[in-house]
Amino acid sequence: MANFFSLGGNQEQQHQEISSSQALVPTESNNWFLYRNEHHHHHHNQEIPNTYKGFELWQSGNTPQHQHQHHQQQQQFRHPIYPLQDLYSTDVGLGVGPSRSGFDISAGDHEASRSGFVMMRSGGGGISCQDCGNQAKKDCQHMRCRTCCKSRGFQCQTHVKSTWVPAAKRRERQQQLAALQQQQQGHNNNNNNHKNKRQREDPSASSLVSTRLPSNTNGLEVGKFPSKVRTSAVFQCIQMSSIEDDEDQLAYQAAVSIGGHVFKGILYDQGHESQYNNMVAAGGDTSSGGSAGGVQHHHHNSAAVATATTTSGGDATAAGPSNFLDPSLFPAPLSTFMVAGTQFFPPSRSP
């Protein structure tokens, strides 16, 4: 069933319902009619597509010729062979292109000034782009796709800047970051090595409490020091106690100057002279324990005073120049302790 509803622009706003078989007699040239097509029509075994069904606006003319043209257009859309497929691409098309919702407008070049054709269609979907015919962006106020909208220079909120980076640029950026990290790591390693080297060269920069005395080896060559020396020295008798033994032990400490260098040490009791001579003849160790408890002796420096003669008062006299040193400078071994009133100096470490 096809019905016409008058949408004329006359002052009386007449409403007419005319059957499709009756003649169409408009009152004015500016009248518009709403045509409703509810049936399927076939032409050459072809069915009217769903996009061509719905409401159609028709504008009438003043002469029967216009009526005949409208009747021909009505028959054309009753039995179409997809006539609107290329409507938006023709030079006479005035519409927004094919879309599932919206409206299309087309007018003939011979009557573009007086009559036109408007077709309204219903359905779901979005708006087509006015330039390329693709689906336009939903929120675009220019009714265009993003590419066409940006190419025309329109300021639209749908122009979102893409955060995608090509794979080649990503690899280049990763290589640059890796090279920068390696360079920073190498710079840090060089700084650490330089700092460690400075600490080794400058022992005073160490945070240890005990400082190492610099060792001067100048003049310690064998040619500058004689194998035997006769000199006079003062031997001071001291009483020492061992940590492992409660019994006290007597020892002598002395210091001599040989070749401009000071040699100092403590002489421990090695037992009776006959026993010591037997041990030396037998090849025994002169630093073994004595008769006072078998205490192990350290810093046995008898070479410098091997030729000295010990008296009962603790004084040793020998031929040679008189060179006496303060006995309080003589250190004691770490494994022993001296009686009260005796100063203790730890021995210096040799390199």
Curated annotation (Swiss-Prot):
Domain of life: Eukaryota
Keywords, comma-separated and alphabetical: Activator, DNA-binding, Metal-binding, Nucleus, Transcription, Transcription regulation, Zinc
Main localization, broad class: nucleus
GO molecular function, one term: DNA binding
Motif (Required for homo- and heterodimerization): 258-261
Keyword ATP-binding on entry: no
Residue ranges the UniProt entry marks as DNA-binding: 129-156
Subcellular locations according to the entry: Nucleus
Designated name of the protein: Protein EXPRESSION OF TERPENOIDS 1
Annotated organism of origin: Solanum lycopersicum
Classification lineage: Eukaryota, Viridiplantae, Streptophyta, Embryophyta, Tracheophyta
Gene: EOT1
